[in-house]
Amino acid sequence: MYSNTFYGGSSSRPGPTGFGQQQPPPPPPPPPPQQQQQQQQPQQQPFPGFSQPQQQNLQPGAFMPQATGFAGSNPMQQMQMPMQQPQPTGFPPSHQFTGFPLQNQQPPSAVTAVTQQQLSAPLPNPPHETGMTSTQIAHSFAQPATPAVPAQQHASSGSKIPNMRLSFITAQDQAKFEQLFKSAVGNNQALDGETAKDLLMRSKLPGSDLSNIWVLSDTTKSGRLLFPEFALAMYLCNLKLTGKELPSVLPERIANEVSSMVDIISFAVPDARPAPPQTNVPKFDAPLMQNASAPPAPQQPQPQQPSNTQLLSQLTSQPTGFYNQATGLQPPSIVQPQQTGFPAQNAGLRPQQTGFLSNTQPTGYNGPRPPMPPMPTGYGSGLSPSQTGLAPLNAQPTGVPGQWGFVNAPATGLPNIEALQQRLMPQPGREGGFTTQGLSGNATIPWAVTKDEKKIYDQLFRAWDGFNKGFIGGDVAIEIMGQSGLERQDLERIWTLSDPNNRGRLNMDEFAVAMHLIYRKLNGYPVPNRLPPELIPPSTRNFNDSIGTVKSLLSQDAESRKSSGAFLQPQQTGVSYLKNHSFRSGSSTPGAGRKDATVFKNNDDAIGDRREAESLMERIRRVQDDIDTDPKAAFRITDSGAERRSLRRQLQSYQDQLPELASNVRKVERSIADARLELFRLKDAKAHPSAAAAIVGTGPGGTVTESDRIKARARARMQARAAELAGRPPPSTDDDGAAARRLEEETASVKAERERNDAMTRDVEESVKEFTRSLEDSLKDVDENSTREHERRRWEEALGVEDTIRDFIYDLQRASRTARVRKDERTASSQRSVSNNRYDNVSSNGDTLPVRPSQPQSTGSPSLAGLTHQERVTSAKERAQKRIAERMAAAGLKPNSDGSGETLLERQEREKREREERRKRAEEEDAKREQERQRRIAEEQNGPPVKAATTGKKPPPPPSRKGKADGVSPAETRKLGDLKNAAREKAEHEGKERALREEQLAQEAESRRLEAEARQQEEELAREREAAQARLRALEEQVRQGKIKKQEEKRRKQLAEKEAKEKEARLAIQRAELEAAQARERELQRQLEGLDEEESSDDEGPVEVTPQNSTPTQSAVLPSATTTMASPPSVPRPATPPAAPFEPELAFEVASATSTSIPSPESVKQRVAADTESRNPYFRKMGQSVDTQPPSFHTPPEQIPDPLSTTEVAPPPASAPAPPKTEIQSTNPFHRLAQQQESQKSAFAAAPLPGPLTRKSRARPEDDEWSIAESENSSDDDDDRPAGGSAKHLASILFGTMGPPRPLSAMDEKPESKSATPVQESPTVAASPPPPPPPPPPPSEPAPVTTLPPAVAAQDVEEDDDDDDENDFQDAPSMPPPPPPPPVPAPFADAPPTAPPPPPPPAFSAAAPPPPPPPPPVGGAPGGPPPPPPPAGDAPAIPKAAVPDAGAGRGALLASIQAGKGLRKVETKDRSAASVSGRVL
């Protein structure tokens, strides 16, 4: 049916399916007769030729009214058949139908009704619809409106508008236009001119504007509008109505969108062929929609029979009947000849004859003559009445499987075949991006290739095969098949099926097979796994059959020859297999009596012939040797056909890769262009954020449509209005069209650059193709025919010769190969030796080594007198390279030039000259060396120089250099009789060569040895340099380290000197303090003498002192309370020098000062001097301060009561806050001593030391919040404080970098020791210490008191001022007993475990101690009350003999303490005593 025609276009398939579907008689007009003949001839598969008379089924009734309107409306038909003009008026339609018995299936009334419909039906022919072209329609707008003539459209497939957005109108407007367009066109695809005019005239625009709008809208110039054109017209009307000017030319973007949508609609309509003749195709879909007002024209009624057989029988009979009845009214006898054309179809023709009775035909054919003119003109050219029925049957005998290329088109036609042809035709600028849209369908496609398909495919093939090569290469086929839009996998399978021989190219039949498979795939058929018989091309089938026939013939011939023995006969190829003429076998073979003309004309058995043959073979060997030894033998052309064929195959493989490379380049160019556009969009959006944010594209692919711009403008206006109302500045917005303009400019530039690159790529492709063609021409065997090739291969490759000759040829080839290999090896070695010797001659010190003459023949160049094959190839290559360089230069590319502009001939000549010069120089050097050698030999032997000259002639190297190539001259080799001379000369030549080789080998060995020695020397020098550099670096490092060490030593020396000076100053102060302390001690002893003491208390005192005696004496560490207690001047027991456990910097100084026994201050002075002289304590403190920690600070709280027990006898105890000092166990500040020595040293140096007996020093403890009055009341409060004011001050100075020590928290554990009367507790604890020591020495030894540090003396002075002995005594236990000084020079030594070291004072724990307290012997003196336990532990207990009434004094003191007398808290600077106390050295 004709539903797939564009505008009612080509209806090339009015098949039976269409007739079966349309039972009522449709009335569209017929196409011209010639075209209809072409269209209908291939349509009917069973009887293709019978479709011709189809036009005249119902013409008598259908064209009755055409008599009046036919002359004016269809002048063409009027001219064709003027003789039938008067006939239309006389034929009633009823008679016409009665004349066709086969049509009696319908009632006459129905036929008549249909006929009336046909009479009133308008013509769908475009010329009859409007009668105007596109230009006429445009001009009609400017003329007054005329009543429109309704016309009928042809496209009956329904208006199908693609789902595509037009960017120049809004979506709402597009929907409205679609609705209006569909209502106007109905089921058609296009809006005719009159209807479009009516619609456009409603806009009330002037005619000139409407004319311009029509010109701009009708882009196809077809006189009708498709939907995109109609939408464009409405858009232009809207522009004019809004007061804008119409553009003179459509913008490119709008034109592209409209044209692309027009193309989509056109491709969507199958078989779109918008040609005017095709508009006459009848329309079967809506016969009732025709307008009766249209003038009638000759129409082609369709048959009403449901049977195709009846239809065909009518169709075949009527043409002949009309043809014979062309004159008009004919008697029935005229109708009889109709049967003559169809003798085999009498069954179908006989009923039709009744319709042509004499009564009906004269009346029935009076009127219908107007439809007849097309038939004689269309079929009268080459058809006879008999041919119309049977001739097509003979010409088209297919429809049978396997008959390839002669199958008629199917009944449903071949949809989209023309669209496929248009798509696949060569078109510029169609690189890719193809889809199957517009090509796919679901039609019924036969396996075999139809005639129409074959015709179209052949046209495609010829269009692509521009050079008429007869085949299409792989690159072109890829481009053609890729345009179909199919998947790559399907195309690969189709190619495999189409190219069964894997030749990489397709001939015409194979191309048709590929296109047919593509067409089937587009219509939904799968690609088969192998070709069916219907699709095997005739050329391939015939060729395969021919090959099979030849193979069978050869096999049969071989079998027959083998069975009959004829295979031994000489064949036509000239190859002889006869063995009776062989050199090695006799005449025992069956063909002994026959002669083989292809071998020799002579008899091989004859002695003369055999000797002659052997002589010839020997001559051939010698000639081959001459050829091999010739200097130019290396350039002998050894090109063979096999090599050329391999080169051609390689060239073909490279040529096949070219399309893929070009395609990849184009793809990369497209991707680069897209990437550049995308990058520009991003950059533009970043540079103009307002424009980017304002418009958001809603069109296809995110494009910005006109509606988007309108919305953006409205939104911008609203924002500006809102900003104005709010008083804000209006937002800055970019021009709406600026972004689009920038994008268009960038797109244009990118497109231009891409086009330039594409042109460059095409130029490169053309250059490569031209180069390929030149190489192919050079590789072709132009000057060799088959005979010469056969002869050459026969004697060079030993094909078709006897075994003896074949073995001889193989021997010659092996000898040639061996000689060539040897020559190549010698050439390479000689070139190396020449280069090495030349280097040695230049670099050696005068003694040159003999150089073996080079072989010029190894580097000779071929003569170019006659260009050989290789030279032709080289010349072609140079020409192609030159052309490529020129094209690249024209394209702006810089070719990679080697810098040498010389041609091949010039380069060869230059190389030849250089070789000659090198050879001459080498010969001259050889001659000089030989003369020098002969001269030295002559001088050594003292012989005449003539002898040297004679000896010099013996091995002349220069002649050997020339003679190497000419030693065995070709003339001598050609003389067969001079074999001995040739052999002798050859032996001499070989001897010379051996001598030269030996000499060269010796030279090479010597040169290698020299090179090895040179390399070894260089390596040794390099190693020595590296060693020297390493030594230099080591020395530099040593010097640097020595400088650093010297600086450190100098710094240490300066520090030691400074410390020594400071120590001397401190010692002087300490001596003054000791003197003051001694005076204080004497005064206290006098006080103690006056006191009444109980004996028990006197006894207890020494008991407590004894265990402390065992501990190493650290009298300097005893608190000041002990000094108050030691009022009797009794001499204490000799005790070990006290060690101050607290002050890290002053520890060793105090230790040195108090290292001697406490009794004698002189010894203390001597020891201090010895310490200062012997060593610098800071060096030892660095290494040992961390390790040596005084155990006194870690004494458990249980040991605290021990001093309390001794304090019963001692003077009043110190203030209550002292006990917490003794209780600090875990906070030993000496743990961090090593890290804080420097800071403590500076702090101690800055801290002021109290004077020995000044009141100022005694008043300082009270200033430090240790008042005497509140000793008892503030004992608990003192636990919370780290120490007295001076302790805090020192701690802040000495331990500023450290956190507050833990003793603050640990002091809470000793509240009982702070009690005002610790004497009662002390006896209980005193039981634990060891028994009392022996009686103290006489009181005449108060020396130990003098050993107390000045700080202790100051504290004693303070105690005297306060007169509160009990408080003083209580303070004694608070004093930390300094640990015994270790023998090591460390500032603190561990005390022996036997003596419980008294707890350290809180000042120790809290901060650095003040200056060292007075020595502990005062507290331990027996004359007075017993000193507190810490001093007893630090110093030896003073014997009771020291004080005459020591026991009584102690008892009185104890009684007063028991009576409740409060002990004054004496601010004994035990901390300073501990800090000053040093280790015993």
From Swiss-Prot:
<feature type="region of interest" description="Disordered">
    <location>
        <begin position="1458"/>
        <end position="1481"/>
    </location>
</feature>
<feature type="compositionally biased region" description="Low complexity">
    <location>
        <begin position="35"/>
        <end position="56"/>
    </location>
</feature>
<feature type="domain" description="WH2">
    <location>
        <begin position="1449"/>
        <end position="1466"/>
    </location>
</feature>
<feature type="compositionally biased region" description="Polar residues">
    <location>
        <begin position="351"/>
        <end position="361"/>
    </location>
</feature>
<dbReference type="Pfam" id="PF08226">
    <property type="entry name" value="DUF1720"/>
</dbReference>
<dbReference type="Pfam" id="PF02205">
    <property type="entry name" value="WH2"/>
</dbReference>
<keyword id="KW-0009">Actin-binding</keyword>
<keyword id="KW-0175">Coiled coil</keyword>
<feature type="region of interest" description="Disordered">
    <location>
        <begin position="271"/>
        <end position="386"/>
    </location>
</feature>
<dbReference type="GO" id="GO:0030479">
    <property type="term" value="C:actin cortical patch"/>
</dbReference>
<feature type="compositionally biased region" description="Pro residues">
    <location>
        <begin position="1374"/>
        <end position="1386"/>
    </location>
</feature>
<keyword id="KW-0677">Repeat</keyword>
<feature type="compositionally biased region" description="Pro residues">
    <location>
        <begin position="295"/>
        <end position="304"/>
    </location>
</feature>
<feature type="domain" description="EH 2">
    <location>
        <begin position="453"/>
        <end position="542"/>
    </location>
</feature>
<feature type="region of interest" description="Disordered">
    <location>
        <begin position="816"/>
        <end position="1065"/>
    </location>
</feature>
<feature type="coiled-coil region">
    <location>
        <begin position="601"/>
        <end position="784"/>
    </location>
</feature>
<dbReference type="GO" id="GO:0006897">
    <property type="term" value="P:endocytosis"/>
</dbReference>
<dbReference type="GO" id="GO:0010008">
    <property type="term" value="C:endosome membrane"/>
</dbReference>
<feature type="compositionally biased region" description="Pro residues">
    <location>
        <begin position="1210"/>
        <end position="1220"/>
    </location>
</feature>
<feature type="compositionally biased region" description="Polar residues">
    <location>
        <begin position="1106"/>
        <end position="1125"/>
    </location>
</feature>
<feature type="domain" description="EF-hand 1">
    <location>
        <begin position="205"/>
        <end position="240"/>
    </location>
</feature>
<feature type="compositionally biased region" description="Polar residues">
    <location>
        <begin position="1"/>
        <end position="13"/>
    </location>
</feature>
<feature type="region of interest" description="Disordered">
    <location>
        <begin position="1"/>
        <end position="134"/>
    </location>
</feature>
<comment type="function">
    <text>Component of the PAN1 actin cytoskeleton-regulatory complex required for the internalization of endosomes during actin-coupled endocytosis. The complex links the site of endocytosis to the cell membrane-associated actin cytoskeleton. Mediates uptake of external molecules and vacuolar degradation of plasma membrane proteins. Plays a role in the proper organization of the cell membrane-associated actin cytoskeleton and promotes its destabilization.</text>
</comment>
<feature type="compositionally biased region" description="Polar residues">
    <location>
        <begin position="828"/>
        <end position="847"/>
    </location>
</feature>
<dbReference type="GO" id="GO:0003779">
    <property type="term" value="F:actin binding"/>
</dbReference>
<feature type="compositionally biased region" description="Basic and acidic residues">
    <location>
        <begin position="869"/>
        <end position="886"/>
    </location>
</feature>
<dbReference type="InterPro" id="IPR011992">
    <property type="entry name" value="EF-hand-dom_pair"/>
</dbReference>
<dbReference type="InterPro" id="IPR013182">
    <property type="entry name" value="DUF1720"/>
</dbReference>
<feature type="compositionally biased region" description="Low complexity">
    <location>
        <begin position="75"/>
        <end position="88"/>
    </location>
</feature>
<dbReference type="GO" id="GO:0005886">
    <property type="term" value="C:plasma membrane"/>
</dbReference>
<keyword id="KW-0206">Cytoskeleton</keyword>
<feature type="compositionally biased region" description="Low complexity">
    <location>
        <begin position="305"/>
        <end position="320"/>
    </location>
</feature>
<feature type="compositionally biased region" description="Basic and acidic residues">
    <location>
        <begin position="1077"/>
        <end position="1086"/>
    </location>
</feature>
<feature type="compositionally biased region" description="Basic and acidic residues">
    <location>
        <begin position="1164"/>
        <end position="1174"/>
    </location>
</feature>
<dbReference type="GO" id="GO:0016197">
    <property type="term" value="P:endosomal transport"/>
</dbReference>
<feature type="compositionally biased region" description="Acidic residues">
    <location>
        <begin position="1262"/>
        <end position="1280"/>
    </location>
</feature>
<feature type="compositionally biased region" description="Basic and acidic residues">
    <location>
        <begin position="904"/>
        <end position="939"/>
    </location>
</feature>
<feature type="compositionally biased region" description="Polar residues">
    <location>
        <begin position="1223"/>
        <end position="1242"/>
    </location>
</feature>
<feature type="compositionally biased region" description="Low complexity">
    <location>
        <begin position="1142"/>
        <end position="1151"/>
    </location>
</feature>
<feature type="compositionally biased region" description="Pro residues">
    <location>
        <begin position="23"/>
        <end position="34"/>
    </location>
</feature>
<feature type="compositionally biased region" description="Acidic residues">
    <location>
        <begin position="1090"/>
        <end position="1102"/>
    </location>
</feature>
